Amino acid sequence: MSRGPEEVNRLTENTYRNVVEQFNPGLRNLINLGKNYEKAVNAMILAGKAYYDGVAKIGEIATGSPVSTELGHVLIEISSTHKKLNETLDENFKKFHKEIIHELEKKTELDVKYMNATLKRYQAEHRNKLDSLEKSQAELKKIRRKSQGGRNALKYEHKEIEYVETVTSRQSEIQKFIADGCKEALLEEKRRFCFLVDKHCSFASHIHRYHLQSAELLNSKLPRWQETCCDATKVPEKIMNMIEEIKTPISTPVSGTPQPSPMTERSKMIGKDYDTLSKYSPKMPPAPSVKAYTSPLIDMFNNPATAGQSAEKTNNSTANTGDDPSLQRSVSVATGLNMMKKQKVKTIFPHTAGNNKTLLSFAQGDVLTLLIPEEKDGWLYGEHDTTKVRGWFPSSYTKLLEENMKEAMSVPTPSSAPVRSISTVDLTEKSSVVIPPPDYLECLSMGATSDKRADAAKIPSTSTFKAPVPRPDATSTSPSDSNGTAKPPFLSGENPFATVKLRPTVTNDRSAPIIR
């Protein structure tokens, strides 16, 4: 492809301008990016060192395990190997800074000045040569005009030949200058790209050597590392022997073998009965989270003798329940009412469930079967005998059915353990209870407990109990209470209820019993 001198000259100037305006600014940007690259690699090396320090710490933990000791040593070795590779990488990147970044910084500043000066020098020489050629061409034109119309044609012809030779030689010089300048400009450009490639090839050789060393090091250790973790269920032989010894108990003489506890068979039978009952027990929804509300008309069903004292009993019931929680129940386990036969209750107030599907609706006088005999926060769970619908309902809206009460009276108390008073009859309301005579003290223990004294002291002085007629052999002097009245013998700390015959009671809301 042939090009004219002017086109080649433009190529030369453009080459110099590309080096000055594009290559050198690109090198400056490359230097900044290289510095960022160095920072990132240094941060990666530091992060890797911290990471593999953590791996080594976990390996130290594993070395304390009887089955993972070898794995712990492998983790420590992996940590040290990778830290060594990171140190080698750090050394290679120090060469990256020294051979590339530092050299580029040094060359770029000098090269900008050099290329600007070279371009200006080329342009100046090219302009001088063009001026000389143009001057010679102008002289040649003058001589040719003179030789055409003058007398001395031979004289001007000789000068014309000389100027033609001068113009021709100067044109050759310009063409040679343009060609040499273009070649020099292209070579200057190539030298700069070659320098950049050479520096990166040198760094690549260092990285290649680093990767070869890393591959050789990892290939020598990786199979052994993988072998230690190929089977996670493998247990060392020493540990297996220990486990087998634990599995195989040492034989003991027959005489030393303990006999099974008699409570074991009882527990098995109880558990079997419980499983049978739980298998056929109804699946019920959870009890309502709110406390069951008490009927506002509940006092209407109390005895007339106690109807006037409902407010006082409500206040006293709160204080009494704090002393002994077992007195809250009107029907205890000892009465036999909590046996497996399902109890029935009769509703005394209507109840509407509303939008709550877990509650049971009923009218006054309906009969319900209790599926769960125990109350939960004032709620009972049962089934309507007519509609066969199940749900929760307030216990204060029902009372025990008559037939259930008769059965409860006929069931004997099977408990052999000492049972405290089961009835929650308010003793202040009973004026017909007869106090036993003082000779009852003979069958009692001489050391009365302090809690019995406290219970006796809680009985108000206005009690309607009839004081017993003192026997002649009784103590003539009896202590007096605070208001000056004679203190009955049973208030001296003895049990006043041992001979009291209690009536069966039915409690609707656990606050006021109904005396039958």
Swiss-Prot record:
Residues 303-328, 454-516 are annotated as: Disordered. The modification Phosphothreonine is found at residues 248, 257, 413. Residues 1-249 form the IMD domain. The modification Phosphoserine is found at residues 261, 281, 332, 415, 421, 423. Residues 115-148 form a coiled coil. The keyword Ribonucleoprotein does not apply. Keywords: Actin-binding, Coiled coil, Cytoplasm, Cytoskeleton, Phosphoprotein, SH3 domain. The keyword Amino-acid biosynthesis does not apply. Residues 474-485 have a biased composition (Polar residues). Residues 340-403 form the SH3 domain. InterPro entries: AH/BAR_dom_sf, Baiap2l1_I-BAR_dom, I-BAR_dom, IRSp53/IRTKS/Pinkbar, IRTKS_SH3, SH3-like_dom_sf, SH3_domain. May function as adapter protein. Involved in the formation of clusters of actin bundles. Plays a role in the reorganization of the actin cytoskeleton in response to bacterial infection. Interacts with RAC1. Binds to F-actin. Interacts with FASLG. The IMD domain is predicted to have a helical structure. It may induce actin bundling and filopodia formation. This is BAR/IMD domain-containing adapter protein 2-like 1.
